[in-house]
Amino acid sequence: MRGLRPALSTFIFLLLITGGVYPLLTTALGQWWFPWQANGSLIREGDTVRGSALIGQNFTGNGYFHGRPSATAEMPYNPQASGGSNLAVSNPELDKLIAARVAALRAANPDASANVPVELVTASASGLDNNITPQAAAWQIPRVAKARNLSVEQLTQLIAKYSQQPLVKYIGQPVVNIVELNLALDKLDE
């Protein structure tokens, strides 16, 4: 029985530290130092939440830039079912899926170049990716320009404005946040 008391007191102490003090401390510090990020990086217009800067959305209309395909279950960009398709590179089903995506993109973008950017046909590991390269966004300019009656130059400038450089120049590549880019497109129409 003597050995039980130190074990039990250690258990209670660690439970309070790891189950109470540590989570409360990290939450408080996160809210203090990074309030926007700690609350989901929500994009707001007035009192309305339009999306998150971290999670893609299913933009399908011709007047919107399309992001990476989503591999989430039940519906595209379902944050509760985050994950990749789990299809191996050697799986013939993946080849069929990519071929179908390429055909659909070529049909929706007849004025674009023949080479479809790879990130427009392959899902990310999370299935929720909201970023594509500026080149993939530029590939879609003819379709978006035609649907919105905007010039290629206007859309090129918009892509450049919403392009984000990597934190370290030689690691990574520039990306465009599709949610922010499409919300900016909607503001042009207002």
Swiss-Prot record:
GO terms for cellular component: plasma membrane. One of its GO terms (molecular function) is P-type potassium transmembrane transporter activity. Its main location: membrane. It is a single-pass membrane protein. The chain crosses the membrane at residues 10-30. Keywords: ATP-binding, Cell inner membrane, Cell membrane, Ion transport, Membrane, Nucleotide-binding, Potassium, Potassium transport, Transmembrane, Transmembrane helix, Transport. The keyword Cell inner membrane applies. It is found in: Cell inner membrane. InterPro entries: KdpC. The keyword Transmembrane helix applies. It comes from the Bacteria. The system is composed of three essential subunits: KdpA, KdpB and KdpC. Belongs to the KdpC family. PANTHER family: POTASSIUM-TRANSPORTING ATPASE C CHAIN, POTASSIUM-TRANSPORTING ATPASE KDPC SUBUNIT. Part of the high-affinity ATP-driven potassium transport (or Kdp) system, which catalyzes the hydrolysis of ATP coupled with the electrogenic transport of potassium into the cytoplasm. This subunit acts as a catalytic chaperone that increases the ATP-binding affinity of the ATP-hydrolyzing subunit KdpB by the formation of a transient KdpB/KdpC/ATP ternary complex. NCBIfam families: kdpC (TIGR00681), PRK00315.1 (NF001454). This is Potassium-transporting ATPase KdpC subunit. It comes from Escherichia coli O17:K52:H18 (strain UMN026 / ExPEC). The gene is kdpC.
